């Protein structure tokens, strides 16, 4: 636990060095250089606090503190540095157009957690580019009980403010690991006896024919290009998601959701008596 800040500092100038420091966290380069990310808004803060996270900086307006006195006290107790800031300063710190009055910084070592070595349901993502899609996928993964997520380094940055917001905080709940190359990971999964499932439009087998009660890794690629050939070659099953003939394809976040909920349905049915 971080120590309680005895005397909260006040920032009223948008030229304060901390404003520039936190604005740098809007970009991947700044987050990597500082080793921390930016949480914006009450909901993300609540999720982080529920996970026992501690913060380098907690910044909030007087209006936000008045509306959320208990949460403000918890934030100060869990922050190395706490600041009461003006609305103008908060707006400069945040990446959103209309921030709700609070931001906090979280160290990267509290975000990245290695997935368990033997996940019953895991998700692998290659070259995913859209932050909204990734955030939605992470939210769905948390809802369906995914135990671990592996992303290639050329995916959109999961620590970006847009991904964090669109995941509604779910990205803070999931063990995630970033990798330069997928084949070594997939080969390890093979040796563990996991089935590796990818969606391919021309596949003759549908996802409904897969036994998701077996330990499974679901693999999805970029919105435009799908999975690379080396990754596809390492899958154990290639399946199609049935759809009307006039529809070319599903959005990748929707496709992931369909697959994960089918897996969850089968697992739930198997564990329900009768």
Curated annotation (Swiss-Prot):
Q: Name one GO molecular function term.
A: RNA binding
* UniProt xrefs under SMART domains: SpoU_sub_bind
**Any one annotated GO CC term:** cytoplasm
Q: What is its EC number?
A: 2.1.1.-
GO terms classed as biological process: methylation; RNA processing
User: InterPro entries per the record?
Assistant: Alpha/beta_knot_MTases, MRM3-like_sub_bind, Ribosomal_eL30-like_sf, rRNA_Methyltransferase, SpoU_MeTrfase, SpoU_subst-bd, tRNA_m1G_MTases_N
According to the lineage, what is the superkingdom? Bacteria
Q: What keywords is this UniProt entry annotated with?
A: Methyltransferase, Transferase
Which family is annotated?
A: Belongs to the class IV-like SAM-binding methyltransferase superfamily. RNA methyltransferase TrmH family.
Instruction: Quote the PANTHER family the UniProt record gives.
Output: RRNA METHYLTRANSFERASE 3 (PTHR43191), RRNA METHYLTRANSFERASE 3, MITOCHONDRIAL (PTHR43191:SF2)
Name-wise, this protein is Uncharacterized tRNA/rRNA methyltransferase slr1673
